[in-house]
Amino acid sequence: MDPYKYRPSSAYNAPFYTTNGGAPVSNNISSLTIGERGPVLLEDYHLIEKVANFTRERIPERVVHARGISAKGFFEVTHDISNLTCADFLRAPGVQTPVIVRFSTVVHERASPETMRDIRGFAVKFYTREGNFDLVGNNTPVFFIRDGIQFPDVVHALKPNPKTNIQEYWRILDYMSHLPESLLTWCWMFDDVGIPQDYRHMEGFGVHTYTLIAKSGKVLFVKFHWKPTCGIKNLTDEEAKVVGGANHSHATKDLHDAIASGNYPEWKLFIQTMDPADEDKFDFDPLDVTKIWPEDILPLQPVGRLVLNRTIDNFFNETEQLAFNPGLVVPGIYYSDDKLLQCRIFAYGDTQRHRLGPNYLQLPVNAPKCAHHNNHHEGFMNFMHRDEEINYYPSKFDPVRCAEKVPTPTNSYTGIRTKCVIKKENNFKQAGDRYRSWAPDRQDRFVKRWVEILSEPRLTHEIRGIWISYWSQADRSLGQKLASRLNVRPSI
């Protein structure tokens, strides 16, 4: 018998119950005892194995994006951008690439309602012919912080109080009162789009600035945007309470039901590009993840479409064990010097090794679908079949070679080692622009939400004043409305 034929898969299920080792089990409802009412015997191997397996079913929860659901489909290029990038999966219109997408909430735990006011994750894994490309984004184009060293703190502030295990806005507002750069993200999170109706009716963004490299070697900064073809729909605060009270998995069910009925969710992919030579022409730093790029100056360019036409086969295997990492890029797409992106390149791989083990990229849902080869051997839960005798490089006995050099940005740097804040902060302009772009009733809902959280009893007069000052600098009328309703004078 070929021992590799019956690899772990439900496709090879026996017609009868067995142990993990394959031995037949004749009774799966009674423990082995001495007599009818005697003590249970330790020699009941099946009992011990069954219970031990059960008590180890849960793996560490994601520290963020714990609540999520995945679906599979394809990405198809619809517009030629081969002049902008040499990425193989973007080489020509009509090219299709298999994908898996994970949608999630960010802050709350694995079993939390999907109606919480929170950022949503929008992560896409492209299984390309040149390896996996993970575009790990959100439904907001910006984030609260611009430097990865602050990431543990912002998550700690957003997460529940470590003493009470209750999420409390006095903690969040205390921490972020030190971060005026967070204002633009609040203009998404506390706007109407802060509670999407479901995952099908929300936008997605790559958030960070990446780089595209053309065959000629020309480099462009790029931002990625996903636009749902069925439009954007949100829940009001009142609707969210009703929907979440009736079904805490409403968005998961909506996604599953839509795909099962043939109503496949679809998004269009657009990009914005910028010549690095032009980065000093703006009143903000293009690598600052707390800022958006103005679309009137850097217009959206269509690239392709994302279609989800298959539900997952198993939640644990294809959602819980699905692992994303912004460090996974392919030739033609590279990182930028965005400080938060640089940190995520390490942090995401590190958290997956903690959750799933050092060989998490061998799991079927994470493994590349193209041929691959390296000498990363052994480690916990390594199940890759290998029969090589050479596990080092170079060798006269192994003909493997390094691949041809792929194009990457050739930046040159000068300067001293330093820890500093970027010079072009400009923390208030874009937040004010977004607020003023809304209709009056939408502005009123935003103000109402801020009045509510700024009324937290444990929030100090000083912190309230700081926030009113921030919003006043973004838009004078907004600050005045908050000050009037809270009976607080702004202070800096």
Curated annotation (Swiss-Prot):
InterPro entries: Catalase, Catalase_clade1/3, Catalase_core, Catalase_haem_BS, Catalase_immune_responsive, Catalase_sf. One of its GO terms (cellular component) is nucleus. Heme binds at residue 348. Its cofactor is heme. The keyword Oxidoreductase applies. Gene3D superfamilies: Catalase core domain. It is found in: Peroxisome. Induction: Induced by cadmium. GO terms for biological process: cellular response to nitrogen starvation; cellular response to phosphate starvation; cellular response to sulfate starvation; hydrogen peroxide catabolic process; peptidyl-cysteine S-trans-nitrosylation; response to cold; response to light stimulus; response to oxidative stress. One of its GO terms (molecular function) is heme binding. CDD domains: catalase_clade_1 (cd08154). Its main location: other. Keywords: Heme, Hydrogen peroxide, Iron, Metal-binding, Oxidoreductase, Peroxidase, Peroxisome. It catalyses: 2 H2O2 = O2 + 2 H2O. The keyword Iron applies. The active site is at residues 65, 138. Its EC number is 1.11.1.6. Belongs to the catalase family. Homotetramer and heterotetramer. At least six or seven isozymes are produced from a mixture of 3 gene products. Interacts with NCA1. Interacts with LSD1. PANTHER family: CATALASE, CATALASE-3. Occurs in almost all aerobically respiring organisms and serves to protect cells from the toxic effects of hydrogen peroxide. This is Catalase-3. The gene is CAT3.
